[in-house]
Every structure is written in C-alpha cells, then in structure tokens.
Amino acid sequence: MAGFYDIISPSNQHRPPVWLLRQVGRYMPQYQELKTNRPLKELFLDTESIIEATLLGPSLLGVDAAIVFTDILSILEGFAIEYRFAPGPEIIYSPHQPFVFTEDPFSTFSFLIEAIQKLTKRLTVPLIAFAASPFTLASYLIEGGASKDCSKTIAFLYQYPDKFEALLNEIIKGTAIYLQLQVQAGASAVQLFESSSLRLPPSLFSKYVVSPNAKLIRLIKQRENPPVSLFCRCFYQEFLSLYATGADTLHPDYHVELSEIYRQLGDPGSIQGNFDPALLLLPQDLLIAHLETYLAPLKQQSHYIFNLGHGILPQTPLENVQAVVKCLTSISTS
C-alpha cells in the first residue's frame, strides 16, 4: 500500500511534493467569478461546481495534488443538520438532539460521488478527499459555527462528558463512511483537519484528539485502506502524541517548528507543512527569500511534503502563490 507521500510525490522528481491548504478559494479571481451571485452552499452541493473549482488548483498553480472542493460542513447533509454560510458558517443544532448518520449515504452524497468519478478521469494528479476530525466537527456543532475560544464546547464536555463522547462516536462513524465513499469513487488519499484542537488543554488532548482520530483512521482504512494525512493545530509535545493515531503523514500547523521535529526525532516519518500563510502577503522577493530559508533544512528530508500551516488567506495575491509553487517545483535536492 502506497503511503500519502508516495501518492502525492511526482515520479522521478527529486524534490518535495507540494499542494496547499485552501489552494482553491477567494484569493483566486477565477473562483470569485465561479461563485458570483451564487450562495456558497450551492457550490459545495453542485457536481459541476465541485469539478470546476477543484480543477483550479492544478490548472492555475501547478500543484502536485488536487483536493476536492467542498467544506468541512458538507458532511452535515448526512446527519440532516441544517447549516448555511452567511457568509461564515452557521449551524442550527442542539447538542442534546439526536445525531445519527444517514442509512443511504450513496443517495445523500450522490452529487459528490459523481464529481469525484468525473474528476479522476480529467485530473493528471492525485485527488485528495477531506473531512473535519471529530473534535473539530463537534466544536462547530456545539458553537453553532467557527469559534476562536470554543468556550461552549469546553464547558459542554466538562458538564456532559458522556454526551460529548457519544457525539464524537457518531461523528467518527459517519465521517468514516463519508470518506470511504469518496475513496471508492476515486479519491487517492484522505486529509483530516483537526483545526479546533489548539484550544484543548494538554490534559485533554489525548482523550479528545488522539484517541478519536485513531478510531477514525482505523475505520477509514478498514475497506480501501487509503493513506491518511492528519492536520492538527497544536504545540510540539502534543504533536509527538499524534504518532499514536496511525496517520500515514502528520501535518502540524505553524506553532510547531519542523526543523525541531527533524532535529529531535531524526527520521520522523512523513511530515507535511507548515509554511506560514501570512508570509504569502509579503512582496514577492521577500516572500521567496523567506521560503528559501524555510526550505533549507527540509528539502533534502525524505518523505517531506511542502504545504502551509493553515489555509491561504483571502487577501493573498494569486501571483505570490504561483511563485511559491514554481519555486518548489524547480528546486533540486542534489
């Protein structure tokens, strides 16, 4: 079974493979044109829009992988949970209401399955399916959308630990089915996003991040056994505990120094990340100088995948992103 790095890495290229978090988005004029006068949710649920947007990554940037154009909330279609973008995500949900995944996921997600089937026929690079990790999706549900402090979630898991555990378990089961469908349709690999984890105290990290992600990854791999990359917002000590999840590739955010990982661990396995997306706002000459400094200790490391420490910011110049990818695809490790 090929690992995440092996699937993403271009053949006969002695350089780090590259793709980017939120590589298709508001910073692209072509994407803005696609979404003109259309609700964002409509784009995520429309087969042809998914196809058109997904293709923008490889066609405009020249990255080594495409990632399915959808949202971490799209899975809520399978739980019959009402949500919208206004413009940010808003979820209509009470953590005390029933939360069970659909018995007919093929019908519920037919729009997505069809998009992936068509994309795999058109793409010349691998296609990555993705979903939120359990704690992150649970926090979105309890907070009613994105939250910087996850205060409602933290209070809920302390007050109702059994209910929170039950919610995580339903998320794990539903997410595994959701991702298996996409792999069966033709996706080559899976990316998980644990974006809310930075808010958890270290004493709860293992219980609510490591253990649930380990369960989810085991379930995802039961059928097609796709390689899985895990993005997680955390600090160094918490990052080390992520090896217990069984993820093929670990992707820390910019709070973790990759050079420190290699210095401490020697051979840490497949690592992805974690260039600060804020640097993409710099004048291009300064951006490339920072990029070259960042890459110096990394580009000769085996199984290293270049990516960002978080998603591309909406105000990022497209030409800066293109310059970063061009720099990556032209370097030599010899």
UniProtKB/Swiss-Prot annotation:
Substrate binds at R22, Q23, V24, G25, R26, D71, Y140, S195, H310. PROSITE patterns: UROD_1, UROD_2. One of its GO terms (biological process) is protoporphyrinogen IX biosynthetic process. It is an enzyme of class 4 (lyase). Pathway: Porphyrin-containing compound metabolism; protoporphyrin-IX biosynthesis; coproporphyrinogen-III from 5-aminolevulinate: step 4/4. The record marks D71 as: Transition state stabilizer. Its main location: cytoplasm. InterPro entries: UROD/MetE-like_sf, Uroporphyrinogen_deCO2ase_HemE, Uroporphyrinogen_deCOase. It is found in: Cytoplasm. GO terms for molecular function: uroporphyrinogen decarboxylase activity. Its EC number is 4.1.1.37. Keywords: Cytoplasm, Decarboxylase, Lyase, Porphyrin biosynthesis. Catalyzes the decarboxylation of four acetate groups of uroporphyrinogen-III to yield coproporphyrinogen-III. Belongs to the uroporphyrinogen decarboxylase family. This is Uroporphyrinogen decarboxylase. The gene is hemE.
